C-alpha cells in the first residue's frame, strides 16, 4: 500500500507538549524498570534465599517476558489507546515492586516477577508505537534516538539513586522507591495528547485515518518477509552472543578481584549507558543520512571487536575502555530495532506484531546464551568462551553484510540526498 506525502506530513501536527511528555515517559519508565534485574537478586540473597531459588524465579519471569512478545504486539495493533496499555503495564511493574518490598515471600515474588515479565512484550513496543503514531515514519529515526537518550538517562539515574538507597537504608527500600516512580510516569503519560497519536501510523498503516482498527495483512505474511526474517535472525544471533559476555566477564573479575568485582561489573554496565546518552541522537541522524544497513554493520562490528578484546585482556581498566564499544552497539540498536521493523512493515498494519516476532527471537537467543557459552568456558577456559562469542559476532557481521537489505524507503533516501547543505 502506498504511503502518501500527506499521511506522513501529519507527523508535524504533534505538539511540543506531547513530544516533551514522551521524553518524560521514557525517562521514568526506564527508571521504574531498573528496580528489577540485579536488585532483585541482591534483595532475595539478603533474605536468605538459595541461589537455586533465585535463579528459578528470575528464569520464570524471563520466560513470561518471552511468551508475552507476540500477544503484546497483537494487542498493540488492535487497541487504539496506547497510553492505556502503557499505564496498565507500568502499574503492573509498580505493583510487583511494591509486593517484593513488603512481602518477599516465594509466591508473591514469583507472581511479581511474572507480572513484570509480562510487560516485556508491551512497554517497549508501545513506546515505539506511540512514537510512530506521533511523528510518522519520516521523523521516526530522530524520535527513537531521543527516546533512547532519555531511557538511558533514566536507567542510569535510577541505578545510582537506588544503589545509594540500598546502601544507606535497605534493599527493600529500593523497591519502595521504584514503585513510587509510577506517579511521575503517569503524570508524564497524561500530558501526551491521545488525539495526536495517529492510530493507523502507530500500526504501520499511515493512510488509515479512521478511529477504527486499520486493515492488516494476514499474520502468515510476516513469515514471508525476507528482510524481516534476516533482521530477526540477526538479532537472535546478536543476543545469543551478547547476553553471555558480561556474566562471563563478571565471573573472571570475581576470581581476580574478589569483593571488588561487584563494583567493577557495575562500572562496566554504567559506561555504555553514558555513551548511549550522548550517541543515541547521532545514531538517529545517521540512520537517515547513511541508511539503516551501514549503521547496523557499525553496531555489530563494534560488538565483534569488543568480544575479541575481552578475550585478549582481563585488566579492569582496559575493559572499561572496551565497554565504550558497547555504547556504540547499544545506541545503534536502540534506534534501529524499531526503525527497521517500521520500514519493513510499512503499509501492513502489523508493525507491532512484527516487533513481537523480532522480540521473541531475540529473547530466545538471550535465554540460550549464558548456558551455552558458560559450558564452553567451563570446558575449555574463559578465553575460549570469549573467542567463541567473537566468532559468533563475526558470523553476525557477515550475515548482515551479505543478506540484510537496506530498508530505508527509496523516496526518503532521495529526499535526504537532495536536501540542501
Where are these regions (language model features)?
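A membrane-interface helix-boundary motif in multi-pass transporters
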Residues: 167-180, 375-392
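C-terminal membrane-cytosol helix-exit motif in multi-pass small-molecule transporters
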Residues: 179-203, 396-404
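Cytoplasmic helix-loop-helix junction between adjacent transmembrane helices
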Residues: 114-151, 340
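Helix-to-loop junctions at the C-terminal end of transmembrane segments
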Residues: 68-81, 279-291
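A late C-terminal transmembrane helix in Major Facilitator Superfamily
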Residues: 350-379
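Juxtamembrane intracellular "pre-TM" segments in multi-pass secondary transporters
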Residues: 2-16, 196-231, 420-421
